C-alpha cells in the first residue's frame, strides 16, 4: 500500500504534488478562454454572449501576447473564474466501436465476480484463490490499459473505469491486487518507459505471467518523500547501479517479480559541478538477485491482498532500467499516483452501488412496528444520502477519466478531489448500511462488515486524504497567487494593461463589494436545473472571495496555515461536486434518460446542501477573530495532550 510522499518543506513540496503535469502555468495577460457553449441559451442570447466575450478577448489580446490558459474548472474556481470547457457538457468520449467492445467485456467480467470469485473465502484465507487469479488472467484483467500490440486489452481510461467499478462492487481486495499491479505497479513503464522497456516487460505483465509492485514507502518515510533512505549508487563503469534499502507495506510485495523502485542517487549539477542526492525511479527484477520480502502483513482489511516488506541488498540494476530521467523520480512517482486516482473513485462508486443494493433489499423486507422500515423517515433520509454520495463519486470518476481521454494534462486537483470524496463517501455509505441493517449488519454473513474493513485503507494510501486536502488547497492557491501577483504588476502600468484591469480587477472589486462578478451558468445547465446552477455560481463567488482575502493576508505564509487550507479544500470539494452533478444531470435531462427526473432530484438536493456548507464555511473563515480563537485552542489542546501523553482531564469521580 502506498501513500503519496512529500519532501522536506511540506508546503513547497505540496505545490509540486501534481508533478509531471505539462500544464502551462496560468499567467496574467492571457486571452479570455473561448466563449462557453451554452446549449440551453437562445440564439440571440448566445450571440450577445459571444460578442461580449469577443470584445473582452480583443482587449486582453492587445494587452499582452496570448498564452495558453488552463481549462481546468478546479484551477479556475480558486481564481473566481467559471471555466466550463472540461465540465460542460458532461463528456461522452467513447466512440461506437469502443462502446460495443466495452459492452462485450462488462457481461463476462460481472459474471466472473458473481459466479467464480468468492470474496468471503478470499478474506478468510487471506489470499486470492488461485482459480480466481487464473480466471482474471484469462479475462485479460492484468493488462487492461496495456496496448494490444504488447499483449494487453488496450482500454482507454473511461473503459478502464467501467471495469474497475465492477471489481470494486464485488471484492476490494482483488481490486487492490489488480490495481497495485497495473494502476501503480507498472504504470510508470506505460507513462515513462522507453520502447525497449515496454517491449521487454509489458507483454508478461499484461498476461499476468509476472506481477508488479510500486515501492515508495519506507519505515522512515510516509508522506515525506525526501526522507527515503534506499540508495542506488552508480558503478564506476556507469553500466549499473547498486541498490540497497527496504520498502514497507508494499501491495503485491511478496508476489511481484517486477518492481518500480524509488531510490536516492547522486546527481551532478552540470552548471556548478555540485553533487546532490535526488530521487530516481528504477525498474527492478526479482531475478537480479538480492531482492527478498518479508512475511505477509496482518491487516484490518483487504486481507486477501498481499502486503509485505521488500528488501534490496546489493541489487545490481542495469543503467538502462532507469525509469524516466536520473533525478526525476519524484516527478515519476507523483505522475503515476495522479494518473491512477480516478480509478479509485470508479472502484468505490462500484462498492457503494453494491452496498446500497444490500441496504435497500434489507429495508424493503424488514418489518418493525408493523411497517416495512423503508417507510420510516429516518431510513428514507439515510438511503437518499447514500445514493447522493454514490452519484457524486461516480460522476467525478467518469468526468476525470473523460478529461484524461480527451488529452487534458491538467486534472491533478480534480483527481485528488475524486479520491478524497470517493474514499470518504464509501465509508459513510457502508457505515449507514450497517446501521440500517442493525445487528444483522454487524454479523459476518452479509459481508458488509468486511467491506467496511476493506474500505478503511482507502483514506490512507495513494496519498492520505489529509495530505491531499493540503495539495488541493495549495495548488489552487498557487495559481490564484500568481494571478494576484500579475495584477499587482499590471497596476504599475495601468494604461498598458487596461483590458486586463477592466476584466479581472473589475470582477474582483465587484465580488468584494458583494455585487457579484457577472458569472452565470444560464444556458449551460439545463433549464430545470437553473436554480441549482445559480447556487453553484454564488458558492464559487463566496469561495473565491475568501481565497483571495486569505492570500492577500498570508501571502507565501499560507503554506503553513493548515487549519485554513483544510477548510478551503472542503469548500473546493463541495464546489467541484456541485458542478459535476449539474453537468451529468443536465445531460440526462437533455437526452431524455428514463432516470432524468431522479437525477434532477439528486442534483438539486446535493446543490442545496453543498451551497449551504460553502456559505457557512466561508462566512466562518471571514470572521477572523473567532477562527483564530478556534485555531489557538486546537493547538493548545493538542500540545497539552502531547505533554501529558494522553487525555489531560481526570475521571469525574477523581480516581
Swiss-Prot record:
InterPro entries linked to this entry: ACAD9/ACADV-like_C, Acyl-CoA_DH_CS, Acyl-CoA_Oxase/DH_mid-dom, Acyl-CoA_Oxase/DH_mid-dom_sf, AcylCo_DH-like_C, AcylCo_DH/oxidase_C, AcylCoA_DH/ox_N, AcylCoA_DH/ox_N_sf
Entry-annotated residues carrying S-nitrosocysteine: 237
Region spans: Membrane-anchoring: 483-516
Subcellular location: Mitochondrion inner membrane
Modified residues (N6-acetyllysine): 51, 71, 239, 276, 278, 298, 331, 482, 550, 556
Binding sites annotated in the UniProt record for substrate: 461-463
Enzyme class label: oxidoreductase
Residues annotated with Phosphoserine modification: 517, 522
Transit peptide, from-to: 1-40
Catalytic activity: a very-long-chain 2,3-saturated fatty acyl-CoA + oxidized [electron-transfer flavoprotein] + H(+) = a very-long-chain (2E)-enoyl-CoA + reduced [electron-transfer flavoprotein]; dodecanoyl-CoA + oxidized [electron-transfer flavoprotein] + H(+) = (2E)-dodecenoyl-CoA + reduced [electron-transfer flavoprotein]; tetradecanoyl-CoA + oxidized [electron-transfer flavoprotein] + H(+) = (2E)-tetradecenoyl-CoA + reduced [electron-transfer flavoprotein]; oxidized [electron-transfer flavoprotein] + hexadecanoyl-CoA + H(+) = (2E)-hexadecenoyl-CoA + reduced [electron-transfer flavoprotein]
Domain of life: Eukaryota
Keywords, in A-Z order: Acetylation, FAD, Fatty acid metabolism, Flavoprotein, Lipid metabolism, Membrane, Mitochondrion, Mitochondrion inner membrane, Oxidoreductase, Phosphoprotein, S-nitrosylation, Transit peptide
GO molecular function annotation: acyl-CoA dehydrogenase activity; fatty-acyl-CoA binding; flavin adenine dinucleotide binding; identical protein binding; very-long-chain fatty acyl-CoA dehydrogenase activity
Keyword Mitochondrion applies: yes
Active site residues per record: 462
Modified residues (N6-succinyllysine): 71, 195, 239, 276, 278, 331, 372, 482, 556, 639
Region (Catalytic): 41-482
Pathway the protein takes part in: Lipid metabolism; mitochondrial fatty acid beta-oxidation
Annotated PROSITE patterns: ACYL_COA_DH_1 (PS00072), ACYL_COA_DH_2 (PS00073)
Function recorded in the entry: Very long-chain specific acyl-CoA dehydrogenase is one of the acyl-CoA dehydrogenases that catalyze the first step of mitochondrial fatty acid beta-oxidation, an aerobic process breaking down fatty acids into acetyl-CoA and allowing the production of energy from fats.
Subunit structure, as described in the record: Homodimer. Homodimerizes after import into the mitochondrion.
Similarity comment: family membership: Belongs to the acyl-CoA dehydrogenase family.
Record's protein name: Very long-chain specific acyl-CoA dehydrogenase, mitochondrial
Gene that specifies this protein: ACADVL
